C-alpha cells in the first residue's frame, strides 16, 4: 500500500557545530490518513564504515496518535559516545541516519554524511594519536541527503510486504542510493520519466555503502528525547529539504 506519511522537510539546526554538541533537527511531515498508533523516530550514528557493531542509537521519539494533516516537531539527541567508536574512525567522515517506523516496521531511512574535523590548523596538519574531542567540529552535509523507502502494512487489511531481495545484502555504490531531489538527469531514459515516480524504491543499505566513502576519506580523496511539540496547520505542498540558516 502507498505510504500514509510523507516527510516534507528536515531542517538540520545548529549546523555546523562542535562534536560534543547535541544533534537537533526540525521535522515536518504529512499524514494522509489518521494514524491510530505512534510513529517511532530514531537517530543513529554510524561509528564505523566496516561494521554495524559500532552503530549507536542516539535517541528515539514516539509521536502519535496522529490526525490527518501536516505536523512538525523538533527532535534532538546527544552526541555519540566516543568510547564506542574506533579511535581511527572518530576523525573523518561518518554517517547519520534518521529512521521512522510504524507498528515496528521501518518505512523510511534518511542518511547524511558527517564530516568530523579539527578547526585548529595545526591539529589538522598534525592530528594527535588520541583525538581531542573538545577540539573537533561536526558538519552534516545537508546537500547530500540519501533516502530509502520500504513498503509496510499500514493496516491489518494491507497485503504482507514482499521479502527483501537478496541483492539488498550486497554492497552498493553511492550512485545506487536515491537522492530526495534530482536537480539534473543526463540520461535520455531518465528524461522520459521526469513526470513519473516509480511505485517502489529498492532497499539500499547506507551502512554498507559507507564502506567505500570511508576508505576514500581516509585516503584524502574526499572532504567532505525528541521534543514532541507538534504543530498541525493543514497546509500542503512540497518544501525542499535543507539546513536552517
Curated annotation (Swiss-Prot):
Species the sequence originates in: Caenorhabditis elegans
Compartments reported by the entry: Nucleus
Protein's recorded name: Probable histone chaperone asf-1-like protein
Gene Ontology biological process terms from the UniProt entry: DNA replication; DNA replication-dependent chromatin assembly; nucleosome assembly; nucleosome disassembly; oogenesis; regulation of brood size; spermatogenesis
GO molecular function: histone binding
SUPFAM superfamilies associated with the record: ASF1-like
Gene that encodes it: asfl-1
Key words of the record: Chaperone, Chromatin regulator, Nucleus, Transcription, Transcription regulation
Protein task: Histone chaperone that facilitates histone deposition and histone exchange and removal during nucleosome assembly and disassembly.
Similarity-based family: Belongs to the ASF1 family.
Region annotation (Disordered) ranges: 157-245
PANTHER family for the chain: ANTI-SILENCING PROTEIN 1, HISTONE CHAPERONE ASF1
Subunit structure: Interacts with histone H3 and histone H4.
Predominant localisation class: nucleus
GO cellular component terms attached to this protein's record: chromatin; nucleus
Biased composition (Basic and acidic residues): 167-183, 215-245
Amino acid at each position: 500500500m502507498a505510504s500514509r506519511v510523507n516527510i516534507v522537510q528536515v531542517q538540520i539546526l545548529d549546523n555546523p557545530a562542535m562534536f560534543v554538541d547535541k544533534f537537533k533537527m526540525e521535522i515536518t511531515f504529512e499524514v494522509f490518513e489518521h494514524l491510530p498508533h505512534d510513529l517511532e523516530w530514531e537517530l543513529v550514528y554510524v561509528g564505523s564504515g566496516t561494521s554495524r557493531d559500532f552503530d549507536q542509537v542516539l535517541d528515539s521519539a514516539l509521536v502519535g496518535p496522529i490526525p490527518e494533516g501536516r505536523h512538525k516537531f523538533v527532535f534532538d539527541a546527544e552526541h555519540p559516545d566516543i568510547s564506542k567508536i574506533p579511535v581511527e574512525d572518530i576523525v573523518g567522515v561518518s554517517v547519520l541516519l534518521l529512521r521512522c517506523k510504524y507498528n515496528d516496521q521501518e518505512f523510511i531511512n534518511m542518511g547524511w554524511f558527517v564530516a568530523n574535523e579539527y578547526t585548529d590548523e595545526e591539529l589538522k596538519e598534525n592530528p594527535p594519536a588520541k583525538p581531542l574531542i573538545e577540539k573537533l567540529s561536526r558538519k552534516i552535509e545537508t546537500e547530500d541527503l540519501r533516502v530509502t523507502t520500504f513498503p509496510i502494512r499500514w493496516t491489518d487489511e494491507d497485503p504482507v510486504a514482499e521479502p527483501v531481495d537478496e541483492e539488498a545484502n550486497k554492497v552498493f555504490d553511492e550512485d545506487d542510493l536515491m537522492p530526495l531531489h534530482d536537480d539534473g538527469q543526463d540520461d535520455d531514459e531518465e528524461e522520459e520519466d521526469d513526470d513519473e515516480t516509480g511505485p517502489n524504491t529498492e532497499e539500499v543499505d547506507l551502512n554498507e555503502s559507507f564502506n567505500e566513502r570511508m576508505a576514500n576519506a581516509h585516503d584524502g580523496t574526499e572532504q567532505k528525547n525528541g521534543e514532541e511539540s507538534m504543530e498541525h496547520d493543514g497546509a500542503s505542498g512540497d518544501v525542499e529539504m535543507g539546513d536552517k540558516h
